[in-house]
Swiss-Prot record:
Active site: residue positions: C114, H255, N285
Entry protein name: Beta-ketoacyl-[acyl-carrier-protein] synthase III
Function: Catalyzes the condensation reaction of fatty acid synthesis by the addition to an acyl acceptor of two carbons from malonyl-ACP. Catalyzes the first condensation reaction which initiates fatty acid synthesis and may therefore play a role in governing the total rate of fatty acid production. Possesses both acetoacetyl-ACP synthase and acetyl transacylase activities. Its substrate specificity determines the biosynthesis of branched-chain and/or straight-chain of fatty acids.
GN (gene name): fabH
Family to which this protein belongs: Belongs to the thiolase-like superfamily. FabH family.
InterPro entries named among the record's database cross-references: ACP_syn_III_C, ACP_syn_III_N, FabH, Thiolase-like
Length: 330
């Protein structure tokens, strides 16, 4: 098969209408707007109502991305959903396929937590580069508000809900300029949404485990230390593959985890603050949704323009981290 180029040709995003401000959180746990904002940069986050689903948010973001790419749902060959919070543990991508009417698309979920969008981007690119598919819909979406302990101020202040999507298409020139992916399972315990089973005897001498999950747990100091060290390193590696220098980057688009992490990574790469995209204050950490959500907002606001070079990096549970360098548009 002939190797093809890749272009990201459309973007979209969707968030729940319900907002929860820092001041309101102080009614739940011992905290304050000043405490949260100075440590995280977050001022509010969006929360999905009980009647809202991950698939509905993802489908709304996808419709925008498909429209902005100038194609229809019937043109989509593959749907990749990066999520850790599916509607159904068996998979939610097929549910989105049905909602969109993307009848010819293969659809499956991919789980890499907050790195999910970057891992999904690289995965989607391989299907296009090898000529298997022409049009891929990549979605990052999470509803972590359903999986946090709302009495734990170390985690409940951080997370919000949302979805973002992009369309990748085969292109005469390759706009994915470089990438690098890494994993380290020895540090898995620093950030978990872990299985928590309850032993149950269903017959004499026959025991099974009734499955459920415990709320998100995190060692914030270790996650910060990991991100501050590993993210600049992997962006440098992706830049080397792209044969570019830091000075050639137009925008730094990181997973929106914590403003201190964004600032530290930018400083270590010598990237000025005006090149750093951040919407963390309005949405909090939306996990796999954070990069495509921030990307779509920046495109719609006119910040990101055709041919701009973007360095993006996702990092989080696993531990996993990755970076990709791409040019916006065809």
């Amino acid at each position: 098969m002939q190797n093809l180029g890749i272009a990201i040709t459309g973007s979209g995003s969707a968030v729940p209408e319900t907002s929860l401000h820092n001041e309101e959180l102080s009614q739940l746990v011992e905290t304050s707007d000043e405490w949260i904002s100075t440590r995280t940069g977050i001022r509010q986050r969006r929360l999905a109502l009980p009647t809202e689903s991950l698939s509905s948010l993802a489908a709304a973001a996808s419709r925008q991305a498909i429209a902005s790419a100038g194609i229809t749902a019937s043109d989509i060959d593959l749907i990749l959903l990066a999520t850790s919070t599916p509607d159904d543990l068996f998979g939610t991508a097929t549910k989105i396929q049905a909602e969109l009417g993307a009848n010819k698309a293969v659809a499956f979920d991919l789980t890499a937590a907050c790195s999910g969008f970057v891992f999904g981007l690289v995965t989607a690119a391989q299907f296009i580069r090898t000529g298997v598919y022409q049009n891929v819909l990549l979605i990052g979406a999470d509803i972590l508000s359903r999986w946090v302990d709302w009495q734990d101020r170390r985690t409940c202040v951080l997370f919000g809900d949302g979805a973002g999507a992009v369309v990748l298409q085969a292109n005469s020139s390759d706009r994915l300029l470089g990438f690098a992916l890494k994993s380290d399972g020895t540090q898995n315990h620093y950030l978990n949404l872990a299985y928590q089973g309850t032993a149950k005897e269903i017959l004499p001498n026959v025991k099974i485990t009734q499955g459920t999950y415990q709320p998100v747990t995190m060692n914030g100091k270790e996650v910060y230390r990991f991100a501050a060290q590993k993210v600049p390193e992997i962006i440098d590696k992706a830049l080397f593959e792209a044969q570019l220098t830091v000075d050639q980057i137009d925008w730094l688009l990181l997973h929106q985890a914590n403003q201190r992490i964004l600032d530290t990574v930018a400083q270590r790469l010598n990237i000025p603050a005006h090149k750093v995209i951040s919407n963390l204050a309005n949405y909090g950490n939306t996990s796999a949704a954070s990069i495509p959500l921030a990307l779509d907002e920046a495109v719609r606001e006119g910040k990101i323009k055709p041919n701009d070079i973007i360095a993006t990096s996702g990092f989080g549970a696993g531990l996993t981290w990755g970076a990709a360098i791409f040019q916006w548009g065809r």
